């Protein structure tokens, strides 16, 4: 039953001397694709299958395992900076928590494709005939040796080289349409051990030794080494196999397709994609495809047509009515004949086998029922042929033959392409900051926020900026805090603008990094007067001048298009910039010195703000020193008593205190420019909570673009936390945002706007439903590669949950 005779690189010889070349199809992301994008993938796969006019194709979907510990260890290598020790300790604790929750390994579906290499006809001459006869004789001798001694298998080097040349051509053809990787000896070893019931080994950690002895004209391998991965006790029952190893046993059952009773309409027929999400247990699938070339297929179809016509005539002569089955079959056969005749396409004999394994018989029965129900819903009827378990088991082995002809389905390339082979949901990176897990597949999601600017192959953006959008209470602040916290642990530096003063207790709740947390709380205390004056806070005088003009025009409502007032104000600000003592109070003095009706008017207007509530923070007389330092790893700037306007309030309706509040946000955000221009080798984050407050005013919008552009050059990401995607969806900003997080929203217009912001079909009802039905802590994530999926944010640690929770205490007690 063991079909493999010899393995060399990715080539496998079977006992019938057929040679298959095996590749791993690198999975492609399939979630949230539009119908058009799905059809593009479908066409590529159809062409991949149709390019082989003859031969066989073996497709395998195998549930392999990947090690959580090795991913976490790789993540530790990314940590730098002052908090390296704390970060590594945190990652170790995280690893232990994850392992205790989901085990050492997580299921990772891999897709393998084997193509039979067809020998090109050699020229018929005496030399080739002699060579062929000699090879046949040698083959006979080796077979005798093998039968008597059962010790080694030999393969002529000429034969190996000949097939390797053919494989190179094949690989070249395949890789034009899909990303593939040639299989290696370790892959074959893992595949065989997996099929014979071994698990608990991570795919990347597995090693398989197959020593070769290269002689002058041939290469030898020990037969024992070849079959070593299959060692286990197999006990065959009617409908399952029992696989016993030294330390454990498992039960395996095989299904095959009996009939497809309805139409499998694309794009909703992607069985390979949906079964990854449907089952909580691993399921393997094998497709053994034999290509029936066009002429042969047409002959078969025409013969079948004659049979059906005979049945029809027989019924007519007997005076009875032809059954509806025969009439339907005649219609289908006519359609198929026309189709094959016009397209000149091949037909495919498909043997489709599903492998289900479990640790005990009861669990196996439950899993088998679940698999059967899933396929039933897709109009595919499965059977477990009694007594054929070992034969169906052998179909999964590389280079194996079709075991049974009773369950063959005749299909076209369209059908095979529509099964979604290689489709999966991928999100984020393979290592980095653990943010949570994919809701659909359960796979861990890792992010590396600083990666965008590195120009990694496959990324669709090089923007470091990120957006967190969603209605109140969905979890956007929590997710944002978690990402900033881990970015700081991994060696980054951050400034958080905290207008609602929600992060003031972080020194107490995050004791391990308390020494690196700097909280700047700007109260309306008289001692803080002038601390937010543009001339005090900005290092660069030119930046201070432009910020001063922005703030004063914002407060007074003077437009740069106002030919009377704006030049007067501009002149006064320039005079202060050029003087030795700089401060906004001097601008008022300068305007009074001008002593014209317009300048006095502007001076009085500005002066009316100076003693209003906490406005004195903005006005200094030039003697105030900058007391805000951003040298720590995590800096939080809070301004007490800020009153932010409602989301829907227009600029004209802003009250005086709202105007002042927004102008302070603009000053602090501009101050972040200095922070961005610090050490370029360190990844920096400027986190703007309640970003909508200044994104909705012209000065704030200009500033946000400036921050984002400066950030890209200086390795700094600007994080916008806002309630509506419309705030960050303006073309100038939208194209400069990399990572996107969208939390629950119930307003249909907002949902459509968010989907459009993510670049996915906004009118697709399924997409709208996904966003509407998100639970707290779940978000739609778009990564740097443009892939979209639903993620459950997972803080792992209780203390982080409490530290970043922004719900009021009363509500929290109710929840508990």
Residue ranges and their predicted role:
Residues 1-410, 420-421:
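Extended, folded cores of ATP/NTP-driven motor/assembly subunits in large transport
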Residues 100-101, 540-586, 729-816:
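P-loop NTPase motor core of the ASCE superfamily
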Residues 60-75, 81-82, 92, 102, ...:
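Switch/coupling segment of Walker-type NTPase motor domains
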Residues 125, 439-445, 450-452, 457-470, ...:
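Charge-patterned, long linear interaction tracts outside catalytic cores
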Residues 53-56, 109, 490-492, 517, ...:
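Short glycine-/polar-rich loops that comprise or flank the Walker A/P-loop
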Residues 35-53, 276-279, 292-299, 380-381, ...:
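P-loop NTPase motor domains
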Residues 312-314, 450-474, 478-484, 497-504, ...:
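Conserved P-loop NTPase motor cores
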